[in-house]
């Protein structure tokens, strides 16, 4: 009877947990639909800004923001995008694994999301700055504020390189940790077929220096929004798997309970029959 009582408790607990994971799956699905529209609009905006900025870069020869042969990368600031909440599968762990595999002793962390703060504090890694005010209503104004801080760190020479590590959204079941260099900017060797269509005043370099804030805030906004949609997709998938596993566990426990109960009833009947036979004998 003790075993039956224990199995019944396990079944009840599994059902309760299943209700929670199913509810979390529904919430994540709703957030995914909401932010999915935002990421589509954001990707279009980011694409346009990139196109314009790349044109400026092609016409620029010298700038502290451009990579050249003299650049010596000794100290990198890693901007790590994590979530504020857990229960989202390997979303945070995969990003942090990519960071650690490239991290040097002199490097520091700019932690975005409370999970990043706790992860690197636990590893005794120096956090230069942090931002935990990141939810699905993350705004371009917030991205600009972060961008201004990063620009200050790089312009002052405090860091030789700034890299963002975030989760790139591919589809609802596929997302991968991605490393993106922000500074110094690599000037791609391309044929300048559109040179005659652009004129920069007073110079391309001056335009670059003035436009770099827009470039940086756009990257920050785009990567965080893309990370957020990946987070919700990862959480929905994790909770769906947890719910399905819970149902399977509940099914197996129910079978075990019924077998134990049947064995108990059979034993009781056997004892009654044996007792009756003894009395009759």
Swiss-Prot record:
Location relative to the cell: Cell membrane
GO molecular function: ATP binding; proton-transporting ATP synthase activity, rotational mechanism
GO biological process terms, semicolon-separated: proton motive force-driven plasma membrane ATP synthesis
Keywords from the UniProt entry: ATP synthesis, Cell membrane, CF(1), Hydrogen ion transport, Ion transport, Membrane, Transport
Membrane topology summary: Peripheral membrane protein
This protein's record includes keyword Transmembrane helix: no
Main location: membrane
UniProt xrefs under Gene3D superfamilies: 3.40.1380.10, ATP synthase, gamma subunit, helix hairpin domain (1.10.287.80)
GO cellular component terms attached to this protein's record: plasma membrane; proton-transporting ATP synthase complex
Transport in keyword set: yes
Coiled-coil annotated residue ranges, if any: none
Top-level lineage group: Bacteria
InterPro entries: ATP_synth_F1_ATPase_gsu (IPR035968), ATP_synth_F1_gsu (IPR000131), ATP_synth_F1_gsu_CS (IPR023632)
PANTHER family according to UniProt: ATP SYNTHASE GAMMA CHAIN (PTHR11693), ATP SYNTHASE SUBUNIT GAMMA, MITOCHONDRIAL (PTHR11693:SF22)
Subunit field text: F-type ATPases have 2 components, CF(1) - the catalytic core - and CF(0) - the membrane proton channel. CF(1) has five subunits: alpha(3), beta(3), gamma(1), delta(1), epsilon(1). CF(0) has three main subunits: a, b and c.
Family the entry assigns: Belongs to the ATPase gamma chain family.
Purpose: Produces ATP from ADP in the presence of a proton gradient across the membrane. The gamma chain is believed to be important in regulating ATPase activity and the flow of protons through the CF(0) complex.
This protein's name: ATP synthase gamma chain
Organism (species): Mesoplasma florum (strain ATCC 33453 / NBRC 100688 / NCTC 11704 / L1)
């Amino acid at each position: 009877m003790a075993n039956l009582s224990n199995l019944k408790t396990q079944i009840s607990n599994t059902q309760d947990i299943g209700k929670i994971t199913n509810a979390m799956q529904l919430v994540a699905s709703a957030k995914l639909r909401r932010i999915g529209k935002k990421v589509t609009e954001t990707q279009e905006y980011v694409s346009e800004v990139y196109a314009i900025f790349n044109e400026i870069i092609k016409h620029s020869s010298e700038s502290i923001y451009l990579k050249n042969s003299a650049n010596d990368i000794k100290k990198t600031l890693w901007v790590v995008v994590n979530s504020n909440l857990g229960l989202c599968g390997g979303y945070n762990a995969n990003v942090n694994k990519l960071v650690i595999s490239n991290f040097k002793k002199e490097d520091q962390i700019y932690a975005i999301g409370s999970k990043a703060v706790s992860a690197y504090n636990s590893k005794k890694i120096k956090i230069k700055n942090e931002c935990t005010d990141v939810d699905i209503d993350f705004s371009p104004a917030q991205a600009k504020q972060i961008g201004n801080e990063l620009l200050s760190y790089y312009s002052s020479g405090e860091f030789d390189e700034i890299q963002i590590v975030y989760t790139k959204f591919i589809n609802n079941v596929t997302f991968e940790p991605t490393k993106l260099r922000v500074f110094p900017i690599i000037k791609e060797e391309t044929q300048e077929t559109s040179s005659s269509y652009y004129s920069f005043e007073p110079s391309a370099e001056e335009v670059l220096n003035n436009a770099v804030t827009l470039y940086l805030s756009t990257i920050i906004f785009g990567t965080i929004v893309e990370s957020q949609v990946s987070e919700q997709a990862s959480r929905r998938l994790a909770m769906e798997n947890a719910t399905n596993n819970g149902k399977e566990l509940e099914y197996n426990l129910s079978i075990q309970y019924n077998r134990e109960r049947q064995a108990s009833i059979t034993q009781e009947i056997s004892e009654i029959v044996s007792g009756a036979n003894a009395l009759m004998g």
